[in-house]
Structure formats: C-alpha cells, structure tokens
C-alpha cells in the first residue's frame, strides 16, 4: 500500500516509517510480544484486518481466541481493496494473514455474526469489537433507484454496470472503481467530487499513480459539485449555483464509510460485565494502516 513505508518518508507528521502488516516497525523495542500472566478467553468480532491483527497478537500472547466473521471469508474490505487494479499485493496480504490465523490454531467461525445470544453462550472474558465499517448511502432524491449501485458491490463483482457511468465521490474508492471499470472495457466514467480536489485521502505515492491513471484513461473529474438528485438516466449536481446534468445509465456511490452499529455488543457486554475493546473501523472509519496498529496495540496492552 506504500502508506506506512514510502509515504512515511514523505510525511513529516509521521515520526517514523511503519507497516500495515507489521505495526511494530519503527518501534520494535516497545512492541515485544510477551506471554500474558493471565491467559483469558477472548471473542474477536470481525475478521477484517483489525480483527485478524487483534486475534493473531492475542493468540501469540497465550490467550484463547475465538474469531467470528459474519461473511464466508476472512480479510474484510482489504480483500476488496486488493481486487482493484495494481493492488493485488493487498489481497495477498489479507490472505497471508488469514493463513497465519489458521496456523496459530485460532478458533475461526465464518458465517457467524456476534450477537448478544452468542456472547451469553460463549461467556468470554473479553470481546474485541472489530466489526468494521459499511458504505455510506446519502439521502439524495433518487438514491434508491435500481440504476444506483454501491462501489463495493462493483469491486466485489456482485453488480455489473454498463454504458455511461457517473461515480459520486472522488476519493480513493471512487477513483479505483473508475480505474477498474476502464480496465474492464467500459467508457471512462465521470467522477463527481464535493471537495475542491480528488485523491485527497490517498498517500503521496498512490496519489501520484492515480493522477497519472486519470490522465491516461481520460476519466473526467468534476470537483466542487454537490449531487442533488438522481433520475433514471441523469445525475444532477449543483456547482457555483448552477445546475449541471450528467447523463448516465448507472450512478455509483463512493462517498466513504461509517462504523457499523455495535449497540447490541455494547449492551450485551455491559449486562454481563464483560470487557469490550473497540478498535479499527468499528471505532472510526479510517485507513487499514490505523486499524491494524490500533488492534495490535490494544491486544498488546490487554
């Protein structure tokens, strides 16, 4: 991903380089994994990068770990990220961490949502809340129309689009979706961004490559525009007080993510007197770099 290493050299706000796959990089002396004096049973809710990092670190410290994932695979959104052009290494990173989880003998339960009933049944000593985030669907007139889809579903192959495509959101996910559509043979989509620039959530290395892709692929980007309506064949936006129309066969939302609802977990743990540790996107939707470091640090301190 280059965000912890290459971007670490360029970003003066970062005290040292780090690594999504190894959060101890740059601070090895303070991140020694030592056996716990009090091994406990820990239920980890969510098998994305944060959940796997927490589970792996907890297991290495001697805790008994039960890792539950609501879907049929480990890796979470990192698997999706690795399905876009030029990012296969990210999918490999998620798959390799999944292999480490299995090799450590962690009790992995796929297709298993962590509910209050499951917590009462397993009676863990603690629960790590790593349920992640889900895409934001804005409340825009027309957002529920059948030609309106979500970027994650395109990347995951659940939805196929064709013809003219307008992508709402010019951050990393929106632009990588545009890149994926161009690579699959579609007409370069139009990307609409509310802010004054695209790629603002990308690290410097990835941003440089994406800006080159935008130019080479002739992806049209319109900034400082607010989408106000979606119709059967049109996305309507407002820019500088003027209404602009963008003909489309499909409109795609890529406007970011928000933490998944953890209300049931919090209530169940509070009722049973069980420690609840919330990390990663379940705490706040961010990059995987922050999610894995937060999970690692929490598991180390547990």
Model-identified regions with their sequence ranges:
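Rossmann-like dinucleotide-binding cores of NAD(P)H-dependent redox enzymes
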Residues: 64-104, 179-225, 283-285
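Active-site/binding-pocket entry motifs
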Residues: 4-7, 11, 24-28, 133-135, ...
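Cysteine-cluster motifs in flexible loop/terminal segments that predominantly coordinate metals
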Residues: 1-39
């Amino acid at each position: 991903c280059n965000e912890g290493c290459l971007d670490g050299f360029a970003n003066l706000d970062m005290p040292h380089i780090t690594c999504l796959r190894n959060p101890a990089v740059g601070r090895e002396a303070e991140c020694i994994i030592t056996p716990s004096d009090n091994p406990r049973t820990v239920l980890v809710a969510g098998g994305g990068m944060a959940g796997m990092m927490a589970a792996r670190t907890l297991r290495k410290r001697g805790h008994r770990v039960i890792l539950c994932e609501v879907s049929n695979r480990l890796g979470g959104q990192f698997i999706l990220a690795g399905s876009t052009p030029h990012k296969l290494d990210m999918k490999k990173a998620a798959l390799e961490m999944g292999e480490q989880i299995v090799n450590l003998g962690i009790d992995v339960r796929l297709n298993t949502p962590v509910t209050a009933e499951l917590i009462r049944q397993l009676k863990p000593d603690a629960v790590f809340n790593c349920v992640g985030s889900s895409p934001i669907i804005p409340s825009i007139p027309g957002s529920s129309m059948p030609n309106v889809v979500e970027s994650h579903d395109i990347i995951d192959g659940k939805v196929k689009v064709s013809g003219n495509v307008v992508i709402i959101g010019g951050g990393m996910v929106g632009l990588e979706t545009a890149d994926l559509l161009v690579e699959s043979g579609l007409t370069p989509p139009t990307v609409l961004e509310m802010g004054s620039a695209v790629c603002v959530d990308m690290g410097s290395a990835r941003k440089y490559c994406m800006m080159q892709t935008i130019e080479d692929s002739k992806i049209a980007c319109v900034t400082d525009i607010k989408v106000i309506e979606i119709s059967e064949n049109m996305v309507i936006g407002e820019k500088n007080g003027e209404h602009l129309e963008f003909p489309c066969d499909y409109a795609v939302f890529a406007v970011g993510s928000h933490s998944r609802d953890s209300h049931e977990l919090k209530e169940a743990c509070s009722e049973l007197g069980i420690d609840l540790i919330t990390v990663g996107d379940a705490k706040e939707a961010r990059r995987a770099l922050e999610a894995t470091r937060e999970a690692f640090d929490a598991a180390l301190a547990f």
